[in-house]
């Protein structure tokens, strides 16, 4: 059975169904209805069309996905003004970064991944580039913030994560917020969390850091920030 994802403000296990027939192995367009219902009987439904395409062929063992990039000068032109700061976020996925060039390009800050959790209930792993990134960012006079990629599914876990983050960053000059990065919505239904519960998890992470003098924030796309977080 295909996994169907949904979330409710207070029900940690809402019913999520797709009404209509479809076949993911057969190319075509399928008119379907997505239905979500909570334990109080509140129901929402949305009509949508599922498009199933032929898979793209890939030759030579490579990837069919094209690598895209953004012109930083274009970002500055669009977003930089007297009321804004423009910067980047970095992790091991960017490899070894020349932060002098980052500074020269016009970046004013860097949000650095300190680490991540290995799935729900998993260990905390320091980003292998964290120490290099933060040392060189600070040496190049860039403002620094932090983020941790979390799978926290309860307040106790969130507190432990915040304490772990504090241990990693306490010896550095962190002048921007420490962010809670929760992106694992593909696993959300298995966590037995409501959106209210998830917000309480984030608040626990924040309050633990704020008690030590750090500013905090959420890390996420505009869509999730508007839809998920209160």
Question: Could you describe each region identified by the protein language model?
Answer:
Residues 60-92:
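Functionally critical loop-and-helix segments that line ligand-binding/catalytic clefts
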Residues 157-160, 224-230:
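Glycine-rich, charge-decorated loop segments at or immediately adjacent to ligand/cofactor-binding or catalytic sites
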Residues 1-12, 57:
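Solvent-exposed, low-complexity, repeat-rich "mucin-like" stalks and linkers
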Residues 51-61:
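Extracellular interdomain linker/stem segments of modular secreted and single-pass surface proteins
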Residues 10-52:
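Serine/threonine-rich, repeat-prone extracellular segments and beta-strand-based repeat modules
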Residues 80-206, 210-212:
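Substrate-binding cleft of extracellular glycoside hydrolase catalytic domains
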Residues 209-227:
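Aromatic-lined carbohydrate-recognition surfaces of secreted/lumenal glycan-active proteins
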């Amino acid at each position: 059975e295909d996994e169907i994802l949904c979330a409710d403000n207070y029900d940690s296990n809402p019913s999520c169904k797709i009404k209509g027939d479809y076949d993911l192995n057969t190319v075509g367009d399928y008119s379907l209805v997505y239905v979500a219902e909570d334990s109080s009987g509140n129901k929402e439904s949305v009509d949508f069309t599922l498009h199933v395409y032929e898979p793209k062929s890939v030759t030579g063992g490579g990837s069919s996905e094209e690598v895209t990039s953004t012109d930083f000068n274009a970002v500055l032109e669009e977003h930089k003004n007297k009321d804004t700061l423009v910067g980047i976020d970095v992790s091991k996925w960017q490899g070894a970064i020349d932060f002098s060039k980052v500074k020269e390009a016009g970046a004013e800050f860097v949000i650095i991944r300190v680490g991540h959790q290995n799935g729900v209930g998993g260990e905390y792993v320091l980003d292998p580039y964290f120490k290099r990134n933060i040392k060189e960012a600070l040496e190049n006079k860039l403002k620094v913030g932090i983020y941790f990629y979390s799978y926290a599914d309860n307040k106790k876990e969130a507190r432990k994560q915040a304490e772990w983050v504090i241990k990693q960053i306490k010896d550095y000059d962190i002048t921007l917020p420490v962010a809670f990065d929760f992106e694992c919505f593909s696993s959300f239904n298995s966590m037995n969390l409501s959106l209210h519960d998830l917000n309480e998890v984030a608040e626990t992470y924040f309050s633990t850091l704020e008690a030590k003098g750090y500013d905090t924030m959420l890390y996420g796309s505009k869509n999730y920030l508007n839809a998920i977080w209160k």
